[in-house]
Amino acid sequence: MRTLQYLLGALFTLGAPAAFAADSTITISGYVRDNACAVAGESKDFTVDLQDNAAKQFYAVGATTPPVPFRIVLSPCGTSVTAVKVGFTGVADSINTSLLKLDAGASAAAGMGVEILDQQQSRLPVNAPSSTMTWTTLTSGQTNILNFYARLMATQVPVTAGHVNATAIFTLEFQ
C-alpha cells in the first residue's frame, strides 16, 4: 500500500509543473524606414495641354497626335526609398480600355482617347493592376523627377472635332 502511495505521489508531482504559470515576455521589434516621397506642389493638380490638333490627322484607328511631355516631381524623398511604381486610374475608353475616356458634352470631341506613356514612350494602360507595373529607380534623400507623355489616339474613324478633356489620378507605390 505504501508503494502505491509513493507511486501516486510521484505521478502527481510529475504532472504538477504543468499547472504552474511562469511570467514570460515576447519582444517584437522592427524598424519603420523612411521609404516614401512627398508629391511636390507643382505635381499635385495640373493640366497637360494636348494643343490644337486637326481632325484629319486621325485618318485611321490608332492614329495619334505627337506626345506631350509632363512630369511628376517627388520631393522630398526619404533616405531609404529605392523605387516607385506609378499607376494611372480613370474612366477607361469603351473601345480601347488602355486609354482614358474623353469627357462627354455638347462641344466635346469623340472617337478618340488619351494615351499615357512612360519616359521611354511605352504605353501605360489606365487602371492597370500594380503587379503589371514596373519599378522606377529613385535616388534616396533627393528630389526625383518622373517623366511621362500624353497624346490623343483615334479609337474610331471618323473622329468628331471638339473640346478634349479627360481626368486621371496617379497612384504611387514605394519600395
PLM ranges: what are they?
Residues R2-L4, F20-Q175:
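Mature extracellular/passenger domains of Gram-negative fimbrial/pilin and adhesin proteins
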Residues A16-P17:
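N-terminal signal peptide c-region/cleavage motif recognized by signal peptidases
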